[in-house]
């Protein structure tokens, strides 16, 4: 039996910023972001980062399955780790867009925007939810039977979210 060890939240975020195995540099980036948030006026910056990342994480996603020639899309509840992984991936993608400015300033700015439910990462999250709504509307059957989508959603119940 394999026991999966949970990494702490900070380690998962630091590993996302790491490039070419340079852990020390990634840790410095994370600590500079925390210091910058505290100089802005946020009292508990660690808690602030965790809460804003939870605001960025999607709860539902879309699964594509091929049935014959057709490719159908179905909504699915995401695992907490998968939702967090998507949010960190979107954060890295939005920070990489602004190459001319400082990396730390971009990360801090994105966290502050996400705390106010704005920013690129939150837009990505709502775009994913738009796909989920489209998947639900496409796959519902008319009639008195339960729709296939409702059965799929019931089968993938949402697990404990932190």
From Swiss-Prot:
Its main location: mitochondrion. One of the primary rRNA binding proteins, it binds directly to 16S-like rRNA where it nucleates assembly of the head domain of the small subunit. GO terms for cellular component: mitochondrion; ribonucleoprotein complex; ribosome. Part of the small ribosomal subunit. It is found in: Mitochondrion. It comes from Dictyostelium discoideum. The keyword Ribonucleoprotein applies. GO terms for molecular function: mRNA binding; rRNA binding; structural constituent of ribosome. Keywords: Mitochondrion, Ribonucleoprotein, Ribosomal protein, RNA-binding, rRNA-binding. Pfam families: Ribosomal_S7. This is Small ribosomal subunit protein uS7m. One of its GO terms (biological process) is translation. Transmembrane segments: none annotated.
């Amino acid at each position: 039996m394999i026991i999966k060890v949970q990494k702490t939240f900070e380690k998962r975020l630091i590993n996302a910023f790491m490039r070419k195995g340079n852990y020390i540099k990634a840790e410095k980036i994370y600590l500079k972001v925390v210091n910058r948030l505290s100089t802005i006026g946020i009292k508990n910056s660690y808690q602030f980062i965790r809460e804003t990342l939870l605001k960025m994480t999607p709860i539902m996603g879309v699964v594509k399955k091929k049935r014959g020639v057709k490719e159908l899309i179905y909504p699915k509840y995401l695992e907490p780790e998968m939702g967090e992984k998507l949010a960190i991936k979107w954060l890295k993608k939005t920070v990489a867009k602004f190459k001319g400015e400082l990396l730390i300033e971009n990360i801090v700015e994105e966290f502050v925007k996400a705390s106010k439910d704005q920013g690129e990462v939150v837009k990505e999250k709502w775009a994913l939810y738009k796909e989920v709504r489209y998947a639900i509307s496409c796959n519902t059957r008319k009639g008195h039977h339960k729709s296939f989508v409702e059965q799929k959603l019931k089968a993938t119940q949402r697990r404990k979210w932190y």
